């Protein structure tokens, strides 16, 4: 399993457009082969900073999503006009357990 951590600080006045694009992409994302889940969080420390945490079956699924044209268009718009700053981290999950499954 792969985790993608996307941290973003939109430019002032751009957050609504960012969330609009994210909502549009979500419909495609939820049907995308290899996608598992996504959640979005707002920082309690850094005003205006958001984090999206998504989980994927494997690296190939992430690469196919990255290459999808409507996702590429959203990335371009983000970099060109919406984002003050962003950072993407991708990592492999080496352990996954919870109270129901145990260790």
Question: What are these language model-derived features?
Answer:
Residues 1-50, 59-67, 83-103:
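Short S/T/G/P-rich N-terminal loop/turn motif that feeds into the first structured element of a domain
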Residues 74:
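Conserved short loop/helix modules at catalytic or binding sites
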């Amino acid at each position: 399993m792969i985790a993608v951590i996307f941290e973003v600080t939109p430019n002032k006045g751009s957050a609504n457009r960012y969330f609009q694009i994210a909502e549009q992409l979500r419909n495609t994302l939820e049907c995308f082969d290899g996608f598992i889940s996504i959640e979005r969080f707002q920082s309690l420390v850094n005003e205006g900073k958001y984090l999206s945490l998504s989980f994927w079956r494997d690296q190939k699924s992430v690469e196919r999503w990255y290459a999808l044209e409507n996702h590429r268009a959203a990335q371009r718009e983000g970099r060109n006009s919406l984002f003050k700053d962003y950072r993407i981290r991708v990592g492999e999950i080496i352990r996954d357990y919870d109270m129901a499954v145990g260790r």
